[in-house]
Amino acid sequence: MIWYTIVNFKMKTSLQIENSGVSAVWKEKVMNALDLAQEIIDGRRITREDDLSFFLTCDLKELCEGADRIRAHFIGEKVDLCSIINGRSGRCPEDCKYCAQSAHNHTNCEVYDFLPEETIVEACKMNESEGVDRFSIVTAGRALNGEEFEKAVHAFETMHRECRIDLCASMGFLNEEQLHRLHEAGVNSYHHNIETSRRNFPNICTTHTYDQKIETLKKVKAEGMCACSGGIIGMGETWEDRLDMAVSLAELGIDSIPINALMPIKGTPLENLPQLTEDEILRTIAFFRYINPLANIRLAAGRALLTNDGEIAFRSGASASITGNMLTTAACATIRSDREMLKSMNRDVTPDYWKEA
């Protein structure tokens, strides 16, 4: 499969581009970002064969403006808001270097087993009353199995019966049968981040592989669920790694792409990494939009690094956001303030279930 190819990110010279038959607009960077945005609106798609270094050298303001035009054309003004509940916390056996919930790291992460169903359903109903589009149960661990998985299925069945909000799950490496059972219980989206590029993945985690991530996402797509997958930037990766991640997600046909900016957590191996600048985050969001024009580009952790909790990102290609409580990083924006901010930008924050009422 094409997404298994290990990419050589030695960027093409203009002569190599000319000889390879790649569109001449890439030669010597004669195209600006706004022209490229129009080509994407007209049907062009960015691939690994293109000179991806363009996105690193073009004018940031033009890149963001072009990304916003692409967003407006393909996604429109609707902003998809999702909220999550940490259904099971801590003691994760995986060694992800960024994560407070890994048992390999030394953090003050709260530890508890799967939450009572009434706690989850109450949170779901609260989010529905506030106008959030979808609600997700997220659990720590390699995969949710056994009695706890059965509890999750029952909780989703209850929420599907009593609520109209869309339902999502993030429960690790589930098999086909488990994904099917969640789907039957009312879950229509499944989240499973690839985290970074194939090249960089072993620097971030060694207890599972990039290929296992890809296989899980293929199962999600085969089940007919929406696939939500993105990653974290600021973990010591290169710009080429970020571009690779964006292209890999496009090749997989991912529907929703959360972009997290690392908020270093004390007690993790990445605790001393510098925080990203706003310009770095915006450039990343923007080129993810160019490369994934049909996907929801979703703001996730790290919004505190952006002006006004990310308002500028919604003018740079973002079309969705996690809102409210955000697991183990500080949540700087509440649901109501997010909705007010987006309404002030003339964005549509009315969930479908309110429109249907």
Each language-model region and where it sits:
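N-terminal pre-triad scaffold of radical SAM enzymes
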Residues: 64-105, 112-136
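Short, electropositive alpha-helical surface patch
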Residues: 149-156, 185-191, 239-255, 309-324
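Core AdoMet radical
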Residues: 104-123, 127-220, 225-230, 255-260
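Conserved, mostly hydrophobic/aromatic
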Residues: 43, 67, 96, 192, ...
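Mobile, glycine- and charge-enriched loop segments
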Residues: 77-84, 91-93, 97-106, 153-160, ...
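Active-site glycine- and acidic-residue-rich loops that bind
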Residues: 170-175, 232-246
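Conserved strand-turn element in the central/C-terminal portion of the radical SAM core barrel
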Residues: 141-145, 216-240, 259-274, 295-306
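Auxiliary Fe-S-binding modules of radical SAM enzymes
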Residues: 4, 8, 12-17, 23-58, ...
